[in-house]
Amino acid sequence: MAAATGDPGLSKLQFAPFSSALDVGFWHELTQKKLNEYRLDEAPKDIKGYYYNGDSAGLPARLTLEFSAFDMSAPTPARCCPAIGTLYNTNTLESFKTADKKLLLEQAANEIWESIKSGTALENPVLLNKFLLLTFADLKKYHFYYWFCYPALCLPESLPLIQGPVGLDQRFSLKQIEALECAYDNLCQTEGVTALPYFLIKYDENMVLVSLLKHYSDFFQGQRTKITIGVYDPCNLAQYPGWPLRNFLVLAAHRWSSSFQSVEVVCFRDRTMQGARDVAHSIIFEVKLPEMAFSPDCPKAVGWEKNQKGGMGPRMVNLSECMDPKRLAESSVDLNLKLMCWRLVPTLDLDKVVSVKCLLLGAGTLGCNVARTLMGWGVRHITFVDNAKISYSNPVRQPLYEFEDCLGGGKPKALAAADRLQKIFPGVNARGFNMSIPMPGHPVNFSSVTLEQARRDVEQLEQLIESHDVVFLLMDTRESRWLPAVIAASKRKLVINAALGFDTFVVMRHGLKKPKQQGAGDLCPNHPVASADLLGSSLFANIPGYKLGCYFCNDVVAPGDSTRDRTLDQQCTVSRPGLAVIAGALAVELMVSVLQHPEGGYAIASSSDDRMNEPPTSLGLVPHQIRGFLSRFDNVLPVSLAFDKCTACSSKVLDQYEREGFNFLAKVFNSSHSFLEDLTGLTLLHQETQAAEIWDMSDDETI
């Protein structure tokens, strides 16, 4: 209990200090602000709290901060008074401990003192109830350290009590109390608020009048000895006023001590119990106003809150157990990502990455590693497609599966992978589809049943690709990548392809076709005046995204059944165990780099020659391909143009697919590779090549 030193002959006036009350929502909002907005900024921030004068007996005078404390325009709860504060959030616990508390208190006290001297506190009495909040948020452990300060100016002289505090019902009649309630409510309604921190009172036996502080000269005109003021009082103690009275008495002494000898104070407490309003427990007392000589210097101030042990020190709250585990997981998942934006990559657009919807075709070694890396980047929407079941050889290389998943013939990979992602992080939207992808050279016309099943599989795949933003091709065979490559090219979806050899790998992005409504000569969205065309496209530099090749563009034969007449080591993907981890990680990093480029999938491809140049994005280069050689621990970044006779992305194939749909696809599935080669012109190319070789041989023989 804080006290003002009193005259030896009179009682001392004591005040009940505020007790801080911080809602869990405040700490959650501070966490979000720290991660997303404040980062390393330690500059003071404006915040807002409130206090209430209607609490039940026994509760302390609380200053409450909720999740809305950071929104200065947020409405104050009904029948509560606002309190304006300043937040000092430090970056380290050491900074929190060594912060100059005395200086912070003096700065806040000076602001209050200036508002008293200038008269702005009369216009806006909320300025008398400022507070400070010094914090440090340990976002790894969810430990929050804080120290409140409620600056209170100290008068140079004592504030002797002329009449000690008594209940309002001992000084006012029932009629006067009802008149006070009515007058207060009318004033609040006139001002458009539900509570007033301070107000003037004038009363006699028959009436009670109230007014705003700024009208004191007219309101008290003719009074010479005593004035009466009302204070919205959050304290419940019968003998002591709350903290908001302290700075008001300094204002009264500074401005009115030459005109009035004393101030009668009504500590207005407005409680509703069992549906009945009651203000009779308010207290009223009279204090003598000391003469306060004019001084430009701010009076001494106090106000730092004591901790739970009653000593001068900060408090700490541990929210790691009481916060919602799913919200904790979500915040923790994003923690490292958002820390990148603080200092290392301040221009990183995480929203583009987190919101992207990824379709993973293949839930094997590559699919598992890609999924884990996507989760590391905060991607929330991941869908698996696979038709295989988990075998005993899988769990050691495929990190989403365990030994139990192999029992009973094995769980479907796609469903098990999606289920495991949700167990790892409940906030992810993971789905699995146990389905086959029809392939060239793998006939589906054995019966009407197989043909209809293939039709359903194609329709399902088309719907999945349409509903996702990025498609990852992570299957075992080359021909299984053909159908999704065609569909994705037709739907203008970004495709990231990863394939493994024994000690080599390729990771690439497919060229992104121009939007269908644009002609061949039109520019791509956001593409700066066909920059690649102006610079001159070559095989090595300045190739824009719409001219890049796909996985099949370097082939001169159509994909077929690659598993026929193959031994076991040729049918299985036999590669060095670390290769899938490397390729899977690079596939995701390539996607993220593409998303960070302002032109997205239309970005000009970076090559090995660009490694010493200024990178096009905050994360670095945006290559077309990454080809790795683990035997040499080396990577190269080749770039290749789209092939006009490509069996997957050429205009002839896409036009045929868009016109005929499944009928065209069924021909590809049921025919040999010559069908696609005839369609695209590869057959003619082979014939021309053979003819050229014959002519070369003839010339040699002649010579």
From Swiss-Prot:
Belongs to the ATG7 family. The modification Phosphoserine is found at S698. GO terms for biological process: autophagosome assembly; autophagy; cellular response to hyperoxia; cellular response to nitrogen starvation; cellular response to starvation; cellular response to stress; defense response to virus; macroautophagy. Induction: Expression is up-regulated by the transcription factor HSF1. It is found in: Cytoplasm; Preautophagosomal structure. GO terms for molecular function: Atg12 activating enzyme activity; Atg8 activating enzyme activity; protein homodimerization activity. Widely expressed, especially in kidney, liver, lymph nodes and bone marrow. This is Ubiquitin-like modifier-activating enzyme ATG7. E1-like activating enzyme involved in the 2 ubiquitin-like systems required for cytoplasm to vacuole transport (Cvt) and autophagy. Activates ATG12 for its conjugation with ATG5 as well as the ATG8 family proteins for their conjugation with phosphatidylethanolamine. Both systems are needed for the ATG8 association to Cvt vesicles and autophagosomes membranes. Required for autophagic death induced by caspase-8 inhibition. Facilitates LC3-I lipidation with phosphatidylethanolamine to form LC3-II which is found on autophagosomal membranes. Acetylated by EP300. Polyubiquitinated on Lys-45 via 'Lys-63'-linked ubiquitin by TRIM32; this modification positiely regulates ATG8 and ATG12 activating enzyme activity leading to initiation of autophagy under metabolic stress. It comes from Homo sapiens. Transmembrane segments: none annotated. Its main location: cytoplasm. The gene is ATG7. Homodimer. Interacts with ATG3; this interaction is essential for the transfer of ATG8-like proteins's thioester from ATG7 to ATG3 and plays a role in the conjugation of ATG12 to ATG5. Interacts with ATG12. Forms intermediate conjugates with GABARAPL1. Forms intermediate conjugates with ATG8-like proteins such as GABARAP, GABARAPL2 or MAP1LC3A. Interacts with EP300 acetyltransferase. Interacts with FOXO1. It is linked to Spinocerebellar ataxia, autosomal recessive, 31: A form of spinocerebellar ataxia, a clinically and genetically heterogeneous group of cerebellar disorders due to degeneration of the cerebellum with variable involvement of the brainstem and spinal cord. SCAR30 is characterized by global developmental delay, hypotonia, variably impaired intellectual and language development, ataxic gait, tremor, and dysarthria. Most affected individuals have optic atrophy. Changing R246D: Almost completely impairs ATG3 binding. Severely reduces GABARAP-ATG3 thioester bond formation. Severely reduces GABARAP lipidation. Changing G511D: In SCAR31; results in severely decreased LC3-I lipidation to form LC3-II. The lineage of its organism: Eukaryota, Metazoa, Chordata, Craniata, Vertebrata. Changing L512P: In SCAR31; in homozygous patient cells it results in diminished autophagic flux. There is a cross-link at K45 (Glycyl lysine isopeptide (Lys-Gly) (interchain with G-Cter in ubiquitin)). A motif (FAP motif) lies at residues 15-17. The C-terminal part of the protein is essential for the dimerization and interaction with ATG3 and ATG12.
